[in-house]
Amino acid sequence: VMFSLFEEQIKHENAAIEHLITSGVESYAESLSFFPELEDYETGPDEYLNLLRRATEAVDIPVIASLNGITNEGWIVTARLMEEAGASGIELNPYYIPANLYTDGREVEQRYLEVLKAVKAAVSIPVAIKLSPFFSATGNMARQFDEAGADALVLFNRFYQPDLDLEEMEVITDLKLSTPAEIRLPLLWIGVLHGRVNASLAATTGVHSPLELIKYLLAGADAVMTTSGMLLHGIGFLTTLVSGLRDWMETRQHDSLAQLRGSMSHANCLNPAAFERANYIKILENYKAEYK
């Protein structure tokens, strides 16, 4: 999966060049023929699409483009360009913070569904959507995305949150990489959704060793994604993950991924209550016991 192309990048670059070309045209109209048209520049998605084309030509594995947009038009036009550039699939990466106090949950959910439906109608390649972890009913939204045609659900979008600098008295917008402790929320919902939706389930966040990869697969993930691990350890981290998974499977005599995938999901584990509220009190009691 490639990094996301942002609709704002497209709009900003196009608007900036348009301004440079047309600003003050009334004062030198006769010289306009010396200036190139906006289309002559490689702006907006052009560099991304060129990289996408080169990637699909260079590797034998599927290359999935990722799109972060804010309007239906922005999603649709760019999604079509990605398909034409050779993408094997598209990941929709909605990043929407409903800061308006008058925007209710149904409106937010409907916006996500409309985007998915619009892109599905515009392209013929598979479309995945990255879910927010803040839906009031995650299972219900997963079902609606599934019924709307999503080919895969990516759990979850990791919204970047600001901090405050107490010395400079300003908002800090730095990037904090994930940690292994963050796998628990996506692990919960992948375990719950496994076998209950037709869409494939992709896990993301917190994969820093083969252990997290194995846990996601046991919960029911069809695919496991990692970014922080790659940034910290480089390309060789992929070999570490695959080797660790293979060693674990051989030790436990698993012959295939299909054999272990979902074997500890909500539907298949010996204690399904561990995924739900029934285990809540036990967790608190165990924690208290450790610190007596």
Model-derived features with residue positions:
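Alpha/beta enzyme core
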Residues: 2-30, 43-64, 68-203, 208-224, ...
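Short glycine/proline- and acidic residue-enriched helix-loop micro-motifs
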Residues: 30-39
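Short, small-residue alpha-helix embedded
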Residues: 193, 227-229, 242
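Conserved active-site loop/cleft motifs that coordinate metal ions or position small ligands
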Residues: 202, 225-226, 258-261
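Helical hairpin unit composed of two closely spaced alpha helices linked by a short loop
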Residues: 223-229, 233-234
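C-terminal extensions of enzymes
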Residues: 233-252, 258-292
